[in-house]
Amino acid sequence: MPTPRVTSSPPPRANPLRYRTIPIIFGSITLFAFSSYCTYVYITLSRASASTVSSSPSEQTDVSTRYDTIARSFDTSVDWTEKVLRITKLRKKLLSQAHGDVLEVSIGTGRNLEYYNWGLTLRDGKGKEVGESKGKVKSFTAVDISEEMVNVAREKFLKLFPGKLGTRWIVGDASTEIPSPPMDTIERDGTLGKRKYDTVIQTMGLCSANDPVALLKNLGDCVKEDSGRILLLEHGRGNWKWLNGVLDKFAEGHAKEFGCWWNRDLEGIIKDSGLDIVDMYSVWWHGGTTWWIELKKPKAISENTEDQDIPPKLRNDEEAKKKWW
């Protein structure tokens, strides 16, 4: 009697995607973000006039008054693009570093307010002070050239954080003299006479300043030496020549609609300011048009005894090259 043949079932086939799930998900998210950015640029360009203009701020017209007109609708017009392009995430990361006496210039509609780690004085419903909340921000001064933008930002703060004291809202040009931190904070810190800020914040502000170099130099005068930091999230020229050509071509139309010149050379502006670069990099998924920048006030030449013969401008350039190239 023949022996029955025993056949075993074939081994299960391995899932070819088993070890590729994370790369596929990451790649899909990256592709979606980049596609969204391209869509945003296309939609914006389709509404703008095509007239190539210079990227130099000295040759660009002042469009800052546009913000008084669009202040009430500004948040609605940029909310979805900032979320899709992960600019909101960059804001959160930037604001997590703010501490002490904080100055935010180009406050706009206050899109950063909810991301600060507030530690301001509290008051009850009757206006009586009842202590201080725990947090890193001890005082807050906001500046913007647009009165309507400041009004929107202040209203937003009062809704988000009712009962908090220690904020000041100033309508003015941030490239001119800015008030020192509140006197009570200075006395509490025991640094009476220095009167400088611990942190200066600006997001998407260099694009609308008439003289961005003068603005940065003024911020350098406002921040503490050594420990103070100027934290910027900005947009300007990108990594590719063709993209910069597109930005130049449609810059005027975009400026008239949104009040900002999106084709400025941020690297050149930063270097011309004379401030020391702590960290600076462009966001690759935006084609290099969005920049994270951390600056500090340079030490006085007399204190740099080891290299006084090196001009400050050259020294800053060499430091930047070490960080970038």
Model region roles, listed by residue range:
Residues 278-325:
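Core SAM-dependent methyltransferase catalytic element
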Residues 80-81, 231-292:
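C-terminal alpha-helical "lid/dimerization" subdomain adjacent to the S-adenosyl-L-methionine
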Residues 7-63:
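N-terminal auxiliary segments of SAM/dcSAM-dependent transferases
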Residues 100-183:
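Class I SAM-dependent methyltransferase SAM/SAH-binding core
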Residues 142, 201, 232:
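Conserved SAM-binding loop
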Residues 213-228:
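A short glycine-rich, Lys/Arg-flanked "PGG" loop and its adjoining helix->strand segment in the class I
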Residues 187-191, 195-212:
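A short SAM/SAH-binding and catalytic strip from SAM-dependent methyltransferases
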Residues 38-99, 111-115, 246-248:
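Conserved class I S-adenosyl-L-methionine
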